[in-house]
């Protein structure tokens, strides 16, 4: 079954709302669409104010009042944002890190 762009974009919105973040590569597989098509969909959805894009994917826009929007995003929110790419980075990095070479960043924390 193929979806038109309207249906695909609505499903992308649903996935972003459920998961918090989505990756272009994963969406291309789910919808049997090219990565270029998915990137165009995400660009369109960002222009409509539905998602915010990051390299390789998109995330749910954090809602809140103007006071919280100006505050820095906390550790928990940063940790959850783009967690799949961070996990892949952590898996690759853990092979290169030896005892005494780490610091307390959120990417390193995912290795634990």
Swiss-Prot record:
One Gene Ontology term of the molecular function aspect: DNA-binding transcription factor activity
Record bears the keyword RNA-binding: no
Keyword Transport: no
DNA-binding region coordinates: 22-41
Domain of life according to the entry: Bacteria
SUPFAM superfamilies: Winged helix' DNA-binding domain
Residues in coiled coil: none
HTH deoR-type domain segment(s): 5-60
Listed Pfam families: HTH_DeoR
Keywords: DNA-binding, Repressor, Transcription, Transcription regulation
Cystine residue pairs: none
Name of the protein this chain belongs to: Putative galactitol utilization operon repressor
Source organism (scientific name): Escherichia coli (strain K12)
């Amino acid at each position: 079954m193929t979806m038109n762009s309207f249906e695909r974009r609505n499903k992308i919105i649903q996935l972003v709302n459920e998961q918090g973040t989505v990756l272009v590569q994963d969406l291309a597989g789910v919808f049997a669409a090219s990565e270029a098509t998915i990137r165009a969909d995400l660009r369109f959805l960002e222009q409509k104010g539905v998602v915010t894009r990051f390299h390789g994917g998109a995330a749910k826009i954090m809602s809140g009042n103007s006071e919280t929007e100006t505050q820095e995003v906390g550790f928990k929110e940063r940790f959850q944002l783009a967690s799949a790419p961070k996990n892949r980075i952590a898996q690759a990095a853990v092979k290169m890190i030896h005892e005494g070479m780490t610091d307390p960043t959120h990417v390193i924390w995912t290795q634990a």
